[in-house]
Amino acid sequence: MPAGLAALIARAGKSRSAPPVERWNPPFCGDIDMRIAADGRWYYLGSPIGREALVRLFASVLRREEDGRFLLVTPVEKLGITVEDAPFLGVELHAEQEEAGADTGQVLTLRTNVGDVVRIGAEHPLRFEQEVGTDGLKPYVLVRGRLEALFSRPLLYQLVELFEERDVDGIRMLGVMSDGMFFPAMAVDFFPAMAVDAASEGEA
């Protein structure tokens, strides 16, 4: 294992503060055989990393560059890794209504597989992509820096149940509200059956 990562592991547990990886600018020392699979699992040298604490440690020093590369960053080295989709996976979603008098209304909070908890809104926006080959929806939330979390399949279904209709630039859209913001997912006409289901649930 590269020296910088080995030193990081040795120091693990001595500090609970998040490493300032956005401020570190060590030399790039090449790519290593580490991969984050589309299901959120981490692999090193082809084998899954079974220790959750180790995965969270590596996740804490993960950074995405402007060119899209994913790097593990320590004070002494930058190492490239492979990410098949998003680096993190959303595993738990809570929807709550703010207290009476608040302007935000519904607030969605997401927990990731590496322990991050984010409140979906202006600082942690939600976006949707169409899944290649199936036209299914893939929701992503910005967690930190340029790093996103992809919703797990069960959470996608939970999110769809919260869909409502809004006009966006003259187009009727399905999407979800959180922290005073509307995040559009698709045009109502694109998935009429889903629109009917969402409208029926909203009237119930």
What are these regions (language model features)?
Residues M1-A204:
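Long, non-globular segments of proteins
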